[in-house]
Amino acid sequence: MGGISIWQLLIIALIVVLLFGTKKLRSLGGDLGGAIKGFKNAMSDEEKKALEDKEAAAQTTQQATEKKPEADKKEQA
């Protein structure tokens, strides 16, 4: 009752096609797809960078903890 029926959606789609034409809609769809693809690539690049930073920090922490016992042994001697 309060929602949009399939017939109303078809009428809206027909009006949009008549106003813009199929060529314009096709190029608009391609542009939108390219934008979404670029956004996904940027997000995956950020995730990779964050993962690399996290691994580098973990490696640095591990190296620091390995050096600390060696320093303690030298102080005891």
UniProtKB/Swiss-Prot annotation:
The keyword Transmembrane helix applies. HAMAP family: TatA_E. The gene is tatA. PANTHER family: SEC-INDEPENDENT PROTEIN TRANSLOCASE PROTEIN TATA. The Tat system comprises two distinct complexes: a TatABC complex, containing multiple copies of TatA, TatB and TatC subunits, and a separate TatA complex, containing only TatA subunits. Substrates initially bind to the TatABC complex, which probably triggers association of the separate TatA complex to form the active translocon. The lineage of its organism: Bacteria, Pseudomonadati, Pseudomonadota, Gammaproteobacteria, Alteromonadales. GO terms for cellular component: TAT protein transport complex. This is Sec-independent protein translocase protein TatA. Pfam families: TatA_B_E. It comes from the Bacteria. Residues 47-77 are annotated as: Disordered. Residues 47-56, 65-77 have a biased composition (Basic and acidic residues). It is a single-pass membrane protein. Keywords: Cell inner membrane, Cell membrane, Membrane, Protein transport, Translocation, Transmembrane, Transmembrane helix, Transport. Belongs to the TatA/E family. The chain crosses the membrane at residues 1-21. It is found in: Cell inner membrane. Part of the twin-arginine translocation (Tat) system that transports large folded proteins containing a characteristic twin-arginine motif in their signal peptide across membranes. TatA could form the protein-conducting channel of the Tat system. One of its GO terms (biological process) is protein transport by the Tat complex. GO terms for molecular function: protein transmembrane transporter activity.
